A protein has these predicted regions:
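Conserved class I S-adenosyl-L-methionine
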Residues: 128-152
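Conserved acidic residues
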Residues: 41, 98, 125
Length: 200
């Protein structure tokens, strides 16, 4: 992100207990296709939120969901047959995973490098990552008549920062090999990446 951008300095817990598939559904659809096309059997969802989409699309796979309280207690109670764990990015899971999903998480964390390094410590085959595109978000907000500060912090109080399309590509490519980067067709502000580890 460009010099002079104002990042939010405090983390606000993102409670998603009641969310189903109104956001990021296309991300999980694309992740499901990637999983099927490659015969993948194991899926890790970092910041799985309500876990609705994880279970909707991957109930036939071995799945692990990572999140924080209070989301964690909610999804453990709601889906007791699945494996949900608490994670603050300090220690990656020991298992290998075919697919890692990190959907609309990176904009919420104070130190995105910590998240990227956490993912890099996981042995995986493909990563699906998504986050809002700042330029599109700001265009939509202006169309609603909202006050928008081009230099941040984001209008959404739960977002620490937001990347433009080009900025995200530059940032993530320093950690992973990007295979595809595109905007989802229905949720217009969502940019999505498919990537692989540089360690493979």
């Amino acid at each position: 992100i460009y010099e002079g951008y104002n990042h939010r300095k405090e983390f606000v817990t993102c409670e998603q207990m009641e969310h189903t598939d109104q956001f990021q559904d296309e991300v999980y659809q694309a992740a499901r296709k990637l999983c099927v096309d490659n015969g993948y059997k194991t899926v890790l969802d970092i910041g799985c939120g309500s876990a609705y989409k994880l279970i909707k699309y991957f109930r036939d796979k071995k799945i692990v969901g990572l999140d924080l309280e209070p989301n964690l207690s909610f999804i453990r109670d709601k889906y007791p047959l699945y494996d949900f764990r608490e994670s603050d990015f300090s220690k990656p899971p020991n298992e290998n995973f075919d697919l890692v999903i990190c959907s609309d998480v990176v904009e919420h964390v104070l130190d995105p490098d910590e998240l990227m390094n956490f993912i890099n410590e996981i042995n995986f085959k493909h990563l699906v990552l998504s986050t809002p595109d700042r330029d599109v978000i700001q265009m939509l907000q202006r169309s609603f008549g909202w006050d928008v500060n081009d230099n941040g912090p984001p209008h959404n109080l739960m977002h620490v920062r937001e990347w433009s399309f080009k900025e995200l590509e530059q940032y993530v490519s320093s950690f992973f090999d990007i295979e595809a980067h595109f905007m989802t067709p229905v949720q217009k502000e969502c940019q999505m990446m498919i990537a692989k580890s540089k360690n493979i």
